[in-house]
């Protein structure tokens, strides 16, 4: 008899529908452990159970910090609205758009921030934040796609960190789970908005 599959934070179909499980055509050595299979088109598909497990782990970890001491970063445009939506509800600091050098390391800067933990949307796009956090010993939680490096990342959340639906769902889940753990929401209570309302507008090139 096979082991019973544990209940996930959201239905498995939602991870597929939002594209959270779909990686790139490149996979770094570390990220292989999160891969479920390679699709016929050559794209790596992530294991939704491992994504779900890491999201739960990240929410538990982040809920131990005072909200105002959590900085959430997104240079990537499709991550900016979800980050702001999360920070409005949790009470953390949103840093979106270009990251000014010295944000975490130069107290003389007007935009200086002194968080206890940093969440980044993409280790490559948000590299400035990752490097600075590492320099001053701030732990980094990151959404990591199959082609990303995990250098200076302390907690990896495997996920499609490019898609607007994917980023909306990920930040919606993190928001809900943090608020549940902090007692703001009941254990079975949802947010007052759907994950689609976390979604950025589509950008046409």
Swiss-Prot record:
The keyword Ribosomal protein applies. The keyword ATP-binding does not apply. SUPFAM superfamilies: Ribosomal protein S2. Keywords: Ribonucleoprotein, Ribosomal protein. Signal peptide: none annotated. It comes from the Archaea. Belongs to the universal ribosomal protein uS2 family. This is Small ribosomal subunit protein uS2. It comes from Aeropyrum pernix (strain ATCC 700893 / DSM 11879 / JCM 9820 / NBRC 100138 / K1).
